[in-house]
């Protein structure tokens, strides 16, 4: 779908209606409007027709590929209108006379037309399209009806203060949009490409792999790369949520979007912009703000019935009592108009999505990226979490602690052939074996002789070196190839090695539990998580040791498909949504099948693609943070829903009793919207 910017979009209800209208068009396959970022995502066969349709139905809106500069909002016309209105009312009450009354009536009529210009035009546009329950149409009906029953001052005051409230609402929405827009504006928009001795300004999207870019102090690294010259400090908080600057020097890996704080750096490009870390952050935040939560979908549906229902109630209040001789029509029409004033669901339509987007924003600033706002809802319902072990609960920094040769082979041979087989693997265990080989053997001739490499998920690898077949993996791997072997010790992770179908020994590898793992599980329990489980492809002894330390159940020696099956059983046992946290390629199926899959940031690309949430800083404490954000977001959203509906219900009752006046009822509409909007902004500070 193509992305467009919508200019002058300041009404959430109008945005929802426009989205529905666009999706009814024959030449539009799909249209989606993101009110919080003022963007239209459109799949159409005729863009010009879409532009013409929008121009005809919403003349004040316009589309463009690029975002226009924001026009400052001026308070002057609003203040002048209010001053004229209050001055006219004051003169009328201080110097009452027939001439003054006529003059003030003319002034009030002009104030009504000036302050209500947008409402009147919007009402006629809506009525022309058959939208009789449009907010503008209802406001026009209410004020004209107030004129008809002799409430001239109140009729004008409604329009003036309603327009003032709408202006403040637009101002508040603009500020909230600016806060949300900041989340997707972390990407650099310029790069300095080095060509010989000159620097050329280019867009990050135009950079190619192996290009050399210069990053000056105070500027952002344009794409992922490696430092080839210079030493500096980088602020990576936009990516990881960590405020502590990171030291970088030659050969240090750097991430696109990092802010250079200290000295000039020369960086060699390793990834295209679309594949770099910052592009993925922007895409995830954009994707999350485009999606609607179940609560938002309910509110959207609810709002379509709410306005007609309140209008019907207002009509009944205005008509029925006089028919039963309970008062005059003028009296009950006035009371009905009070109820009519609270017929707009804007407080809900605006505050609910902004609340969720604020939660997404708060999470992203802490290095927690979500792929949809629905995740926030599910997180508040879960009571169970399952973890992968290696790299998730443990540091994933493996070290070879012992080499045990068998059948007449030496330690050097076992390590050499194991490293040979693992050369093309990026698994942490493989990297530890390669590192040990480099340190012990100082030999890398075998690097050029590897072919027919194959990784068997959850078991190990096999590869051919010259004409020799090397197999390295767990006991399941040996059983698969019918290789006889002797028992291995129960402590640590074991990599068995076979050469040409002959067992030659095993390597013992150790891993450490993460420093914050115990504290994380304790804090998760305090957040209401009751059930914990470790699902690991590692052997039983290594998994059991970690599980005993953390005090949770475990399942070991699992293949990827077995891990998914066991997780499903774990979830069904507690009959509630469950979370899975993992980081490896073999975790991808389970992450995809979980109600909420959480991928650790240093894990494989496949695991991050399968996850609903990506924790960029790789810290387990972020699990506690994201649950707290989800709960606070849900609490604030339901505060808004109950507050808005409660206040509106109160004004309907007060209108029925004849206690509330029309201008007071304006607070029940615009005032409640402003308060709900302000409350929603608290989610950004979650």
UniProtKB/Swiss-Prot annotation:
<feature type="topological domain" description="Extracellular">
    <location>
        <begin position="658"/>
        <end position="665"/>
    </location>
</feature>
<comment type="similarity">
    <text>Belongs to the cation transport ATPase (P-type) (TC 3.A.3) family. Type IB subfamily.</text>
</comment>
<keyword id="KW-0170">Cobalt</keyword>
<feature type="binding site">
    <location>
        <position position="11"/>
    </location>
    <ligand>
        <name>Co(2+)</name>
    </ligand>
</feature>
<feature type="binding site">
    <location>
        <position position="583"/>
    </location>
    <ligand>
        <name>Mg(2+)</name>
    </ligand>
</feature>
<dbReference type="InterPro" id="IPR023299">
    <property type="entry name" value="ATPase_P-typ_cyto_dom_N"/>
</dbReference>
<feature type="transmembrane region" description="Helical; Name=8">
    <location>
        <begin position="666"/>
        <end position="681"/>
    </location>
</feature>
<feature type="transmembrane region" description="Helical; Name=6">
    <location>
        <begin position="333"/>
        <end position="350"/>
    </location>
</feature>
<feature type="domain" description="HMA">
    <location>
        <begin position="1"/>
        <end position="62"/>
    </location>
</feature>
<dbReference type="GO" id="GO:0016463">
    <property type="term" value="F:P-type zinc transporter activity"/>
</dbReference>
<protein>
    <recommendedName>
        <fullName>Cadmium, zinc and cobalt-transporting ATPase</fullName>
        <ecNumber>7.2.2.12</ecNumber>
        <ecNumber>7.2.2.21</ecNumber>
    </recommendedName>
</protein>
<feature type="transmembrane region" description="Helical; Name=3">
    <location>
        <begin position="132"/>
        <end position="151"/>
    </location>
</feature>
<dbReference type="Pfam" id="PF00702">
    <property type="entry name" value="Hydrolase"/>
</dbReference>
<dbReference type="InterPro" id="IPR017969">
    <property type="entry name" value="Heavy-metal-associated_CS"/>
</dbReference>
<dbReference type="InterPro" id="IPR006121">
    <property type="entry name" value="HMA_dom"/>
</dbReference>
<dbReference type="GO" id="GO:0046872">
    <property type="term" value="F:metal ion binding"/>
</dbReference>
<dbReference type="InterPro" id="IPR036412">
    <property type="entry name" value="HAD-like_sf"/>
</dbReference>
<dbReference type="InterPro" id="IPR051014">
    <property type="entry name" value="Cation_Transport_ATPase_IB"/>
</dbReference>
<feature type="topological domain" description="Cytoplasmic">
    <location>
        <begin position="682"/>
        <end position="686"/>
    </location>
</feature>
<feature type="topological domain" description="Extracellular">
    <location>
        <begin position="93"/>
        <end position="102"/>
    </location>
</feature>
<keyword id="KW-0460">Magnesium</keyword>
<keyword id="KW-1003">Cell membrane</keyword>
<keyword id="KW-0812">Transmembrane</keyword>
<feature type="binding site">
    <location>
        <position position="587"/>
    </location>
    <ligand>
        <name>Mg(2+)</name>
    </ligand>
</feature>
<feature type="transmembrane region" description="Helical; Name=5">
    <location>
        <begin position="309"/>
        <end position="327"/>
    </location>
</feature>
<feature type="binding site">
    <location>
        <position position="11"/>
    </location>
    <ligand>
        <name>Cd(2+)</name>
    </ligand>
</feature>
<feature type="topological domain" description="Cytoplasmic">
    <location>
        <begin position="1"/>
        <end position="72"/>
    </location>
</feature>
<feature type="binding site">
    <location>
        <position position="14"/>
    </location>
    <ligand>
        <name>Cd(2+)</name>
    </ligand>
</feature>
<keyword id="KW-0472">Membrane</keyword>
<dbReference type="InterPro" id="IPR023214">
    <property type="entry name" value="HAD_sf"/>
</dbReference>
<keyword id="KW-1278">Translocase</keyword>
<feature type="topological domain" description="Cytoplasmic">
    <location>
        <begin position="175"/>
        <end position="308"/>
    </location>
</feature>
<dbReference type="GO" id="GO:0008551">
    <property type="term" value="F:P-type cadmium transporter activity"/>
</dbReference>
<dbReference type="Pfam" id="PF00122">
    <property type="entry name" value="E1-E2_ATPase"/>
</dbReference>
<dbReference type="InterPro" id="IPR027256">
    <property type="entry name" value="P-typ_ATPase_IB"/>
</dbReference>
<feature type="transmembrane region" description="Helical; Name=4">
    <location>
        <begin position="155"/>
        <end position="174"/>
    </location>
</feature>
<dbReference type="GO" id="GO:0005886">
    <property type="term" value="C:plasma membrane"/>
</dbReference>
<feature type="transmembrane region" description="Helical; Name=2">
    <location>
        <begin position="103"/>
        <end position="124"/>
    </location>
</feature>
<feature type="topological domain" description="Cytoplasmic">
    <location>
        <begin position="351"/>
        <end position="635"/>
    </location>
</feature>
<dbReference type="InterPro" id="IPR036163">
    <property type="entry name" value="HMA_dom_sf"/>
</dbReference>
<dbReference type="InterPro" id="IPR018303">
    <property type="entry name" value="ATPase_P-typ_P_site"/>
</dbReference>
<keyword id="KW-0104">Cadmium</keyword>
